[in-house]
UniProtKB/Swiss-Prot annotation:
The keyword Heme does not apply. Coiled coil: none annotated. InterPro entries: Ribosomal_bS16 (IPR000307), Ribosomal_bS16_CS (IPR020592), Ribosomal_bS16_dom_sf (IPR023803). This is Small ribosomal subunit protein bS16c.
């Protein structure tokens, strides 16, 4: 199963995350199948590849709780419901 989850980058105390599609059994820093976004918690910046995320979710990818919240705030799930 493919999951959408956060992959940690950055220095100590200055975390940034990439939102990646990765096999559910891979470790957090494992090889990603696809990079679909960026999330900087400190500056509250988010950059998403919306088309790639929508396609992955339609194919069955499951977001983690944190990624789900990020996608919900960006309105991804409304787009999926609007265009089935």
């Amino acid at each position: 199963m493919v999951k959408l989850r956060l992959k940690r980058y950055g220095r100590k105390q200055q975390n940034t995350y990439r939102i990646v599609a990765i096999d559910a059994q891979s470790r957090r820093e494992g090889r990603a199948l696809e990079e679909v976004g960026f999330y900087n918690l400190r500056k509250d910046q988010t950059q998403l590849d919306i088309l790639a995320i929508v396609n992955l979710i339609r194919e069955g990818a499951q977001p983690t709780e944190t990624v789900y919240d990020i996608l919900r705030k960006a309105g991804i799930f409304e787009r999926i419901k609007a265009n089935p």
